[in-house]
Amino acid sequence: MVWRAAGYLAVPALLAAILLWWISASLGVGVGFHRLLTHRGFKTPKLVEYFLTVCGTLSLEGGPINWVVTHRIHHAHADGPGDPHTPRDGGWWAHIGWMLNGTAQKYDRSVMARYAPDLMKDKFHLWLNRVYWLPLVFLSLALLAFGGWSYVMWAVFFRVTFNFHATWLVNSATHMWGTRRFPTEDDS
């Protein structure tokens, strides 16, 4: 009730959060970081690649090169020694511990060059990897100017927090529970 009285439960702000979640998580991380950059599942003009990459940074899951390196290392060592977020080290570790205490997002240049040599040659990706938080700062300022604090709370803070847990559930829950459709050595 206090939130509603303060104007923080504004429906337009919630709709902005849902739209930005789709843009950042689905387009940015799912299509951009994951399918395009990590797996090179399709080709696109560089401007589209850069747009999707910037959208991915709005999820605040790290720079594009660090995200790709983490995911490629995960596939190289799926649910075994060397996997940054294996659930075999515990559900808490797979969900959030690896982000707080692990090596993810803390790669030196040699590891990045080994796992993402394609991206290390691209000046835009190198730059965005260093300042990945900057697009979200600009978006936050625009939302504040356009809609006030309710937009910032819903479309930035709550959206990013919700998306963190949605992403982490993929690393924890989907590798811990469910049925395995194909015979593999990992827990996915």
Predicted regions located by residue number:
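Active-site-proximal inter-transmembrane loops
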Residues: 115-123, 177-188
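Non-catalytic, topology-defining segments of multipass membrane proteins
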Residues: 1-168
